[in-house]
């Protein structure tokens, strides 16, 4: 007792407290003193990977309903911020867009696109700004999209004729998904390579390549999240498959480049406004830039190949998936299909073809597509971004190097923004100025900000004309007298979320 009351010990107390303070400052991470977003418990090594599931957009929504619209997960050793509200999406894709404009490094995209030299996966910087500018100003400008209008019209006309022939030759149900996939491949191939390169053999190669790319882009690469496990790719076969697919894509595109270069040399073509008016294909435009005939722009050969492959993988998947889900929702909702039938056939009455002017008058068609993309955004989890610096979002501290995922699917079904969000009701968009351009963060099926989809106008042009022509020329019914609600709407897993089963229907050509 006397020892405890010794005055000399009291004199040491301030020194002791100072030592404790220094110890805490030295051995406590600064981030622990800052407010981080809420997180579910994680496991050693894998973090929260076990909670992702085969349909991540659904499992992440379930987690966000418990942990909030901005939550922090850990995929292996990588911190991953998940945004599941319009407010959080706005913070990331608008308020702090520049901080979140780069992409995380990906082994798969590096291998398939020559070190991520494409538009989708290229890190933010001078190179990305250059290729994005080429895409926006030369490949997918409004003028360019209009110049490809004849390709879209010709290919959709071919599809209608092929479906007609199939109906005449057989009364069995038609796999409509096969026809729309072939249509999308043909359109992309024609505008990318030119019609002469879209023969049966090349189309077969392209289809096989796209299937391989789609499958592998959805594969989990352990090395991206747990670096010391990268070696397992050799044993799982991922490295070998990547090498095969990269070679397959390279050989296909190199063959087309060589053919274009020979033709251009023979014809001594030069890049000018007249070429644009003729509707030059993407490869011609990119090779002109590669050869230095377009002032202010430059590309190497690998960049040309990466951008072209990007057009195929992103363009085909996005358009085909949007068409497929739109048809599925129409079959599930006969009232909506009947209303759309009426509009399309009234506007195009007495016409064999639907013009751009006709499409402009089809308001219900436009809201049907908008509603489909609300419920079924082609890429439900927008391609991941990465923070380039420490930043505060919605009161939470976010570290530099944090991956960021915006769950566009969850936001499009949030009852906070949408009345009866699970209901397919196109009328909710009537009279609304909400569109696809990424200005309304409760609705971003094609992303927003610097990383929004540059092919938006082109994709919507193809989807609109395809749906309008199918509805104009045919009546559809589910086989075996199945009820609309019996149509299987199960999703397939993947970066782009397709309908798992193809759309198979009875088709009857209408009198026009």
From Swiss-Prot:
The positions annotated for binding heme are 453
Identify the main location: membrane
What are the names of the required cofactors? heme
Q: Which residues cross the membrane?
A: 3-23
Q: In which pathway does it act?
A: Alkaloid biosynthesis
Q: Which GO terms describe its biological process?
A: alkaloid biosynthetic process
Q: Which reaction does it catalyse?
A: norfluorocurarine + reduced [NADPH--hemoprotein reductase] + O2 = 18-hydroxynorfluorocurarine + oxidized [NADPH--hemoprotein reductase] + H2O + H(+)
- Name the Pfam families for this protein: p450
- EC no. given is 1.14.14.188
Q: Where in the cell is it found?
A: Membrane
**Molecular-function GO term, any one:** iron ion binding
Question: Gene3D superfamilies this protein is in?
Answer: Cytochrome P450
Do you know which InterPro entries this protein is assigned to? Answer: Cyt_P450, Cyt_P450_CS, Cyt_P450_E_grp-I, Cyt_P450_sf
List keywords of the entry alphabetically.
Heme, Iron, Membrane, Metal-binding, Monooxygenase, Oxidoreductase, Transmembrane, Transmembrane helix
Per the record, the similarity remark reads: Belongs to the cytochrome P450 family.
Protein function: Monooxygenase involved in the biosynthesis of curare monoterpene indole alkaloids (MIAs), natural products such as diaboline, a pharmacologically active compound used to regulate blood pressure. Curare alkaloids act as animal glycine receptor antagonists. Catalyzes the conversion of norfluorocurarine to 18-OH norfluorocurarine.
Protein's recorded name: Norfluorocurarine oxidase
Name its species: Strychnos sp
**Which gene holds the coding sequence for this protein?**
NO
């Amino acid at each position: 007792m006397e020892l405890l009351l010794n005055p000399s010990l009291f004199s040491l107390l301030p020194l002791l407290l100072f030592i404790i303070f220094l110890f805490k400052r030295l051995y406590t991470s600064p981030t622990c003193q800052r407010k981080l977003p809420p997180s579910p418990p994680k496991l050693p090594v894998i973090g929260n990977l076990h909670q992702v599931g085969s349909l991540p957009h659904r499992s992440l929504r379930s987690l966000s309903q418990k942990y909030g619209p901005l939550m922090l997960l850990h995929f292996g050793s990588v911190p991953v911020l998940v945004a599941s509200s319009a407010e959080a999406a706005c913070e990331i894709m608008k308020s702090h867009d520049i901080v979140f404009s780069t992409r995380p490094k990906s082994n798969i995209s590096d291998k398939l696109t020559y070190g991520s030299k494409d538009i989708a996966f290229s890190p933010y910087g001078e190179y990305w700004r250059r290729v994005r500018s080429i895409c926006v100003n030369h490949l997918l400008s409004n003028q360019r999209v209009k110049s490809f209008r004849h390709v879209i019209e010709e290919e959709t006309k071919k599809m209608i004729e092929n479906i007609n022939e199939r109906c005449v030759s057989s009364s069995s149900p038609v796999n409509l998904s096969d026809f729309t996939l072939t249509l999308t491949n043909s359109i992309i191939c024609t505008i990318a390579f030119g019609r002469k390169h879209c023969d049966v053999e090349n189309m077969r190669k392209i289809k096989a390549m796209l299937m391989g790319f789609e499958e592998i882009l959805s594969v989990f690469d352990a090395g991206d999240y747990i670096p010391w496990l990268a070696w397992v790719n050799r044993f799982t076969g991922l490295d070998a498959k990547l090498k095969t697919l990269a070679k397959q894509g390279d050989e296909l595109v190199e063959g087309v480049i060589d053919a274009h270069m020979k033709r251009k040399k023979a014809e001594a073509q030069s890049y000018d406004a007249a070429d644009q008016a003729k509707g030059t294909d993407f490869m011609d435009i990119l090779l002109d830039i590669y050869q230095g005939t377009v002032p202010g722009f430059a590309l190497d050969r690998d960049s040309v190949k990466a951008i072209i492959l990007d057009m195929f993988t992103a363009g085909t998947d996005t358009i085909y998936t949007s068409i497929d889900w739109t048809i599925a929702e129409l079959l599930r909702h006969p009232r909506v299909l009947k209303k759309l039938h009426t509009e399309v056939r009234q506007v195009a009455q007495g016409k064999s073809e639907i013009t751009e002017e006709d499409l402009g008058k089809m308001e219900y068609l436009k809201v049907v597509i908008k509603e489909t993309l609300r419920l079924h955004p082609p890429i439900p989890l927008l391609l991941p971004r990465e923070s380039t610096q420490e930043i505060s979002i919605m009161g939470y501290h976010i570290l530099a190097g944090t991956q960021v995922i915006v769950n566009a699917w969850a936001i499009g079904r949030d009852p906070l923004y949408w009345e009866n969000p699970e209901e397919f009701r196109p009328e909710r968009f009537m009279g609304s100025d909400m569109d696809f351009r990424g200005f309304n963060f409760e609705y971003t099926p094609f992303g927003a900000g610097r990383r929004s989809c540059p092919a938006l106008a082109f994709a919507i042009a193809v989807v609109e004309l395809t749906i309008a022509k199918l509805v104009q020329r045919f009546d559809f019914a589910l086989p075996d007298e199945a009820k609309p609600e019996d149509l299987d709407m199960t999703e397939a897993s993947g970066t782009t979320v397709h309908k798992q089963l193809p759309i198979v229907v009875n088709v009857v050509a209408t009198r026009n």
